């Protein structure tokens, strides 16, 4: 080997290894790389591998004290992106030794830390990660998962129904609890704190928790069904978050909520461990995700954030609607919905899945469809998301002309109609409107809802689309 030689060096000499055969313990990453002009693709791919593992910008003599070959990330494959000039997918393999066990925080600090501010790249985006079985096994994952949740709630054979309480800011705790009661009484399974309801001057968290618990018990007694309200425990410190979760448990609440990106993965994993130890379900909101995942050329795709959440832990996570007001293309969305729910997912580039992922029975996460959806969307949502999902109608419940409880009734009737039609073998995509119309004949609440929302559409092209194949 060559002795120590100072100076700046090309990354590709060390970090571009097309002959490398990936190990099943490696963490694999697919980056979409948009380089500065004049930098050859191998150098860019190698640069990403280096900066996100052992490399630094110059030769350092301490390299001689370790085995670079053992610890370095390797760019093992580069492919041009069809239809894009000068853009590549760089595949990088990281040896498992580089990562702390059971820490999503550490995994991200390594893989998407410094490298994203790197000058040689105009833009870089992490499209997908393959988490090896050996690493997955160091995580607890979701506190309970889909099957345990159904058993706890005694609800089978249909999607679950939720509603975010609006107006999201400004209600007093008692009025807030009243809205919760009306929705649950009308037929919803859950109501939800908005993600930015934490503990503000107009409604402190403890007051809200108390009135919501009262609403849950009252609605359960009247309907004979198990009800829940996602009590948002997100707080300014981890200690305060756990304090809120403890109080929720003392009230006998079935589920709490956390904003996992603004709260951070460390806090989220702590909350998930607390929830499993104490029998609480954990609803996860993805506030801030679009800052990270919306641009096609830079940032991180949501499927990576979704995988990270399954490792860190949550029983529900918001995953777009495909039909409402928020971003989500159908194939891409279904790709990461499967990554959240299923145990084994095959590589399938037509759905944006770059790697085969085996979760080795880590519990699944229920995808939550929420944002600009209403009764007319119900057949499409039932068709797209299937039974293992939570459909959330905020305005689509509370905007009902007769009030909150009738709004909840309308949604529950629409859902039961769609599930019944599906079980009879009808085509929900083609006959959706007809199914809702038929159901509205015997439900005045649904008929009124159909009238209000018959013209509402959110038609914009998605910003983040699949590459042409």
UniProtKB/Swiss-Prot annotation:
User: What GO terms in the biological process aspect are recorded for it?
Assistant: photorespiration; reductive pentose-phosphate cycle
CDD domains, per this entry? Answer: RuBisCO_large_I
Q: How is it modified after translation?
A: The disulfide bond which can form in the large chain dimeric partners within the hexadecamer appears to be associated with oxidative stress and protein turnover.
Question: Which reactions are catalysed by this chain?
Answer: 2 (2R)-3-phosphoglycerate + 2 H(+) = D-ribulose 1,5-bisphosphate + CO2 + H2O; D-ribulose 1,5-bisphosphate + O2 = 2-phosphoglycolate + (2R)-3-phosphoglycerate + 2 H(+)
Report residues binding substrate.
114, 164, 168, 286, 318, 370
Per the record's keyword annotation, is Plastid included, yes or no?
Answer: yes
The EC number(s) attached to this protein equal 4.1.1.39
Q: What is this protein called?
A: Ribulose bisphosphate carboxylase large chain
> Gene name, please?
rbcL
């Amino acid at each position: 080997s060559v002795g120590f030689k100072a100076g700046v060096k090309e990354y590709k000499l060390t970090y571009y290894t097309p002959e490398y055969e990936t190990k099943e313990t490696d963490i694999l990453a697919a980056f979409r790389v948009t380089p500065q002009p004049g930098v050859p693709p191998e150098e860019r791919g190698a640069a990403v591998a280096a900066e996100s593992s052992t490399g630094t910008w110059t030769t350092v003599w301490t390299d001689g004290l370790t085995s670079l070959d053992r610890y370095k990330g390797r760019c093992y494959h580069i492919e041009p992106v069809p239809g894009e000039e000068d853009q590549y997918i760089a595949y990088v393999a990281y040896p498992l030794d580089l990562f702390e066990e059971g820490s999503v925080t550490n995994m991200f600090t390594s893989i998407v830390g410094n490298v994203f501010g790197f000058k040689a790249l105009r833009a870089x985006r992490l499209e997908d990660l393959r988490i090896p079985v050996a690493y997955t096994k160091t995580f607890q994952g979701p506190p309970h998962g889909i099957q345990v949740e159904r058993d706890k709630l005694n609800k089978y054979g249909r999607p679950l129904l939720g509603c975010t309480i609006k107006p999201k800011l400004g209600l007093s705790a008692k009025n807030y609890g009243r809205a919760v009661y009306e929705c649950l009484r009308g037929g919803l399974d859950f109501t939800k704190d908005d993600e930015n309801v934490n503990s503000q001057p107009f409604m402190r968290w403890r007051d809200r928790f108390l009135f919501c618990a009262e609403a849950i018990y009252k609605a359960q007694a009247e309907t004979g069904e198990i009800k829940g309200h996602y009590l948002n425990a997100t707080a300014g410190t981890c200690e305060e978050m756990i304090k809120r979760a403890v109080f929720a448990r003392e009230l006998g609440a079935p589920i709490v909520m956390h904003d996992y990106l603004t709260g951070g993965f460390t806090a989220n994993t702590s909350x998930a461990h607390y929830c499993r130890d104490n029998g609480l379900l954990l609803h996860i909101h993805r506030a801030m995700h679009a800052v990270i995942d919306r641009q096609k050329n830079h940032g991180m795709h949501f499927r990576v954030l979704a995988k990270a959440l399954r490792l860190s832990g949550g029983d529900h996570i918001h995953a777009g609607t495909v039909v409402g007001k928020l971003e989500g293309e159908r194939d891409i969305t279904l790709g990461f919905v499967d990554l959240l729910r299923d145990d084994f997912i095959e590589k399938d580039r037509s759905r944006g899945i770059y790697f085969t992922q085996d979760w080795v029975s880590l519990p699944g996460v229920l995808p939550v469809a929420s944002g600009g959806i209403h009764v007319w969307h119900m057949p499409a949502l039932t068709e797209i998301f299937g039974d293992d999902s939570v459909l959330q109608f905020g305005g689509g419940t509370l905007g009902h002309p007769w009030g909150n409880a009738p709004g909840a009734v309308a949604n529950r009737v629409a859902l039961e109609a769609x599930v019944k039609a599906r079980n009879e073998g009808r085509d929900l995509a083609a006959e959706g409107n007809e199914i809702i119309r038929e159901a509205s004949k015997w439900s005045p609440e649904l008929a009124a809802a159909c009238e209000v929302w018959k013209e509402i559409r959110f038609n914009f092209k998605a910003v983040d689309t699949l590459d042409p194949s």
